Amino acid sequence: MKKNLCIAFFLIFLNGLNAQPPNGCEQKITSKILIVGDSWGQFMFLYKGYKEALRQYGFADITELGGATTIIGAQTGTWTRGLGKKNLRAQLLMHPEIEDVVLMLGGNDFVWDYDYGDPIEVLDNSIARTNLGMDTVVNIIREIRPDVRIILPSYDYPNFIDPLIDLPLNPYFDSWESFGFPNPYEANTSMQYIEAKREAWSLTHPNIIFVQNLGLMQYHFGQKDSLPDTSPLGYFYPRLPPYAPKTVPFPFGNQMYPTPQKAMGLLGFDAYHLGPAGFQVFAANHIKKVLLDKLRGYPTETILSDSLNDGWVNSVGEFGTGEIKIGKDRMLKEHKGILSFSTKNIPDDAIITGISIFITRKKIEGNNPLKSVFPNNAKIDIMNGPINGLLPEAEDFSVRMDMEDVGCFVGQANRNNYSTRIDLQSDAFSFLNKTGITQFRISYNSTIQNTASLVKYYNGGAIDEEPLAAHMDIHYELPQQEKVKQAPNNENCAVFPLPAKNEINLRTTKEIEKVSITDVLGRQLSFYGLETENKKIDLGNFSKGLMVLRIYYKDGTIEEKKIIKS
């Protein structure tokens, strides 16, 4: 009862936290993600975890749905009968724009069947029963929308230690007590067993993608303080030292530690659920591993900007390379950013169908210029070739470009490491230099008067596990005889198993000359020479997640396949 009252009060507070919709050229927001689930799904939706993570990656015009399809305490049966089933069907029918369904569901079906002291294997029958319910949920979704992908994220570890060990009045204390006061190692190894069962179930369904999140919060947040050593009940827990972010392995983390309290909900007093920051990290993990490639439209080519030639120029004739500076500094000098891309490898006969540029905020001086009348105050100009020379020069500030004001800016980049996406209009495509360098100039006409509003962005040399580097996605088609074939059921090549663990097999009806594997940003990971019809490719050295396999046939055709390493 304590727990339900606490959650109910908190949800009333959360319902008032609705951010203003982001602006875009058409100020149009599309709901491409549907969350179906229990309390994890409901908190994810109420905290707008996906919405905020999508802003982080430059997709402020995309958001999630879930108000009618997430309920605290929900089980699989909630969505397979009665009002829950009706709501699920209605959302799928009313929103044809949905492309991915996230199932944050299943835990409530079996977790309460566990009695302290029993081996974890006693849950096998309950998990099997839960999987039958999950089968029914999937069938309901497939009946209406057979085309959508279904994402099954794991949960992450609980934290009974920090919020409960000194506060027996916590609404989750009864749950901890009913499980026999398990320490983090006991709770975490049980979670690993359960999630392995859930992952195995996901592999029995086509087009379901399991995303492992165990240990994610440990990896991202670290443990700031050492853990307590005793509880009021005399329960002993060894004091463990703090650790810095990104120093434990991911996935799975350190089994001796709980999820850090900083990631937990209810201001750190929740033992099970994440808070706003935690759910944003949770959503960002799914976006990077599963959604980002689709949101970017599977670009034909991705080019990092040339960090040596990237830079800035300002209104008093100063200029420099390195950071990309845009806006007004503290002396009210206006800065314009210069981006340089080597586009010489784009085929001469390529028919360009789309170009998007992503720039990521590194830091800010003063106010955010994009918060005023964005996007009307943001402008990008294009030059076929260098503006003057390859490096920024004073004249670059005012020189006439080949075409000006050619892009739609999406995303205000209201935090460091947030990206703004710039979609170029089709009139600008003809100015892409297919034999050399294409340069861009970006400026902000901030309405913030007499104060600094300077944004500094990463250039193309920023290397990190996050996509921080300035880059350009190019979509193009080739004449029919060279056109890349992307039909998912193309009979020329079969790739199996998918998802894959350590290797994939290729079986083709045509002779292969070579294959390449790229990551979701289009960066080449490896090249292989292949000459026979049946081949194996070792994925052991690649990180888990989505990759693109490109197959080059000896007849000159090319085929692409999306592959997932789990």
Pin down the residues of each PLM region.
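Beta-strand-rich interaction/scaffold domains
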Residues: I364-I437
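A short beta-strand element within beta-rich, extracytoplasmic domains
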Residues: F341, I351-I364, M472
